[in-house]
Regions:
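Catalytic core of non-heme Fe(II) oxygenases with the double-stranded beta-helix
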Residues: 38-109
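A generic structural micro-feature
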Residues: 27, 48-52, 123-125
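Non-heme Fe(II)/2-oxoglutarate
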Residues: 1-26, 43, 68
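Catalytic core of Fe(II)/2-oxoglutarate
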Residues: 90-137
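Short helix-to-loop capping/linker segments positioned immediately adjacent to catalytic or ligand/cofactor-binding
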Residues: 20-24, 42-46, 57-58, 116-119
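A short glycine-rich, His/Asp/Glu-containing loop-to-beta-strand
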Residues: 28-36
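Hydrophobic residues positioned within well-ordered beta-strands of beta-sheet architectures
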Residues: 33, 54-56, 127-131
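Short loop/turn segments at connectors of secondary-structure elements within structured domains
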Residues: 29, 63-65, 125
Length: 137
């Protein structure tokens, strides 16, 4: 029962995110989920998730000072703009790297193809769950 309610929460959250982002004409399923326990000094090298549309990280035990997720725009790809000009200010559309403010209990959903990770964790017991979403049959 508890597992079903967690899955329902995650699927509804993914649906809501999709409607505010790419708005794909899809229903979603969870392909996999895993827990991560990070001790002091742990890091998660920048990476992407393949064969899924969206990924999410649920912060289960996240104290102030634990390492936040950092997202990076892939600037080595052929689709990165050829022409660039100085920016007046940074926005979500022109930054090459961003750290999202987060707190315990937050669910952060992002495109699976977006590079993400975190740098050296300064404290023990950073617990998170990562979930990957795929199209439902």
């Amino acid at each position: 029962e508890d597992n079903r309610s967690v899955a329902d929460f995650l699927l509804k959250s993914c649906k809501d995110y999709n409607e505010g982002a790419y708005y794909y004409d899809l229903d979603f399923a969870i392909s996999d989920a895993y827990l991560e326990l990070a001790s002091k000094g742990a890091l998660y090298a920048p990476h992407e998730h393949s064969n899924c549309i969206y990924s999410a990280t649920l912060l289960i035990n996240y104290q102030e000072g634990h390492s936040p997720l950092k997202f990076r725009r892939n600037v080595a790809g052929s689709y990165y703009p050829v022409m660039q000009f100085p920016n007046k200010d940074y926005t979500a559309f022109n930054m090459t790297e961003a750290t999202v403010p987060m707190k315990e209990g937050d669910l952060i959903i992002y495109p699976s193809s977006m590079t993400h990770g975190y740098e050296g964790n300064p404290y023990d017991d950073r617990v998170s769950m990562t979930v990957n979403f795929i199209p439902d049959k």
